[in-house]
């Protein structure tokens, strides 16, 4: 299982979101970059996903019963997004916009930075199934951008969903960059 941190820039409205989040978290210099930095010491992630791998032993908890990559090389990921529809197989809010969802993603591109997750994979997969369709926390996003808007405890944004799935206390305090830094710190402490 890995943490995938998105460092690319989407086109259209999602790209504007990537840039605004990067402006808030990484500063003006990173705001204007459209290509990922080769220097991974610069944290500039604007989105977080948890990636399930074939060796994780949670095939039975995946939407199609396998952690094997599909024909496009995409692996099952879990996160919360504001601008994607919840898949039809979700137990909660299928077809609705925004929230916790499973999605197959090719994370083996330079748009993603991957870090090992030293956490209980089964607990994360169970959390993912139990929370599919949970609403996206737009208020927390506004709070990151303006510093004054509180989060809604029943809703989660991407890094908050990932941190909560991992069992990290105060998950609402994590943004994509601080979650990536926390995971890298855990990995460094283990080595």
Kindly label every feature range from the protein language model.
Residues 2-112, 141-150:
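Glycine-rich catalytic cores of cysteine/serine-nucleophile enzymes that process amide/ester linkages
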Residues 53, 132, 166-170:
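Hydrophobic/aromatic-lined pockets within catalytic cores
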Residues 98-101, 106, 116-141:
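A structural motif
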Residues 139-191:
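Activation targets extended, charge/polar-rich intrinsically disordered C-terminal tails
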């Amino acid at each position: 299982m890995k943490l995938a941190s998105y460092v690319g820039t989407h086109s259209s409205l999602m790209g504007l979101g990537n840039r605004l989040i990067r402006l808030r978290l990484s500063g003006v210099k990173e705001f204007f970059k459209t290509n990922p930095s080769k220097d991974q010491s610069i944290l500039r992630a604007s989105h977080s996903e948890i990636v399930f791998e074939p060796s994780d032993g949670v095939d039975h908890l995946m939407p199609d019963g396998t952690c094997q990559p599909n024909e496009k090389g995409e692996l099952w990921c879990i996160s919360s997004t504001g601008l994607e529809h919840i898949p039809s197989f979700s137990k909660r809010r299928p077809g609705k916009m925004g929230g916790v969802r499973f999605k197959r993603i090719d994370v083996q591109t330079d748009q993603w930075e991957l870090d090992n997750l030293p956490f209980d994979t089964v607990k994360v997969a169970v959390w993912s199934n139990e929370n599919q369709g949970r609403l996206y926390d737009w208020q927390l996003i506004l709070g990151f951008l303006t510093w004054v808007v509180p989060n809604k405890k029943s809703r989660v944004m991407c890094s908050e969903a990932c941190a909560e799935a991992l069992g990290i206390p105060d998950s609402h305090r994590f943004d994509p960059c601080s979650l990536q830094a926390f995971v890298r710190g855990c990995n460094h402490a283990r080595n």
